[in-house]
Amino acid sequence: MGSTMEPPGGAYLHLGAVTSPVGTARVLQLAFGCTTFSLVAHRGGFAGVQGTFCMAAWGFCFAVSALVVACEFTRLHGCLRLSWGNFTAAFAMLATLLCATAAVLYPLYFARRECSPEPAGCAARDFRLAASVFAGLLFLAYAVEVALTRARPGQVSSYMATVSGLLKIVQAFVACIIFGALVHDSRYGRYVATQWCVAVYSLCFLATVAVVALSVMGHTGGLGCPFDRLVVVYTFLAVLLYLSAAVIWPVFCFDPKYGEPKRPPNCARGSCPWDSQLVVAIFTYVNLLLYVVDLAYSQRIRFVPSL
């Protein structure tokens, strides 16, 4: 998983890219991803935002996985101006989260045990159930790669392969869920305090993405300050910022003085501001916990930026 080319005279093709445990997991990702996408596109069907997200997630993961396997097999990854170990570790974690979400959403919104009344309804049901099974297998294939490539205690590795690096991807993913709930009629603009919370989410998200981007591009060595120290300082600040949001957001959304402590009975399903506010509150605490765990692990990581 290094970023250097083989010495002259070596084999041009790297068979270990498809025969090693990690390579086998990637081949299975391609097989399961293509099967899932094809089943849904051919007869299973999809609709709405949820279906579009699932298809986009599967298509994106398949395309990048194919690129990774091709570059590993032909040893062309050494020609790319990025840290290959950081890139593959970050993508595997992101793909795991995307495929996990799709593996939950597609069966929840589209899979049914009963046949639909339209012609060939039972065939569509069978295709959707099969797609749901392969979507779950696809998630497991990416999760296996994350488990195989994760840095072990005492092992020197690329930053994104450490627990702290993997948590950065999860933090950014959770922040995207928060943003999705915020734009879905959460009424965050009513108070300056809730606007502060949005600023916290945005600032921490941008900083996390910057850390991931610098690691993947291999530019962590030219910052004028040790990268691991910067990561620890930023993570500590993120914990403080999220702690403030974890206190402020519930008060200004669910306290009787400012908001609704209970879900309004006349609130329509799918378009209720209270639901969006609850989602934001829950995932604020999730991200706070992730940053606390990240801070604990950041104290003892050892990594090589160029891997």
Swiss-Prot record:
Among its keywords, does the record have Transmembrane?
yes
Segments traversing the membrane: 53-73, 90-110, 129-149, 163-183, 198-218, 229-249, 278-298
Segment forming the signal sequence: none
GO-annotated cellular components: cytoplasm; membrane
Write out the entry's keywords from A to Z. Membrane, Repeat, Transmembrane, Transmembrane helix
> Topologically, how does it sit relative to the membrane?
Multi-pass membrane protein
Q: What is its main location?
A: membrane
Q: Which cellular compartments is it found in?
A: Membrane
Protein's UniProt keywords contain Transmembrane helix: yes
Alphabetized InterPro entries for the sequence? Marvel, MYADM-like
Q: Which residues form the MARVEL domain?
A: 17-154, 159-303
Q: Which domain of life is it from?
A: Eukaryota
- Write down the PROSITE patterns for this protein, in alphabetical order: MARVEL (PS51225)
Matching PANTHER family, A to Z? MYELOID-ASSOCIATED DIFFERENTIATION MARKER MYADM FAMILY MEMBER, MYELOID-ASSOCIATED DIFFERENTIATION MARKER-LIKE PROTEIN 2
**Family the entry assigns:** Belongs to the MAL family.
Query: What name does UniProt use for this protein?
Result: Myeloid-associated differentiation marker-like protein 2
Recorded source organism is: Homo sapiens (Human)
Gene symbol of the encoding locus: MYADML2
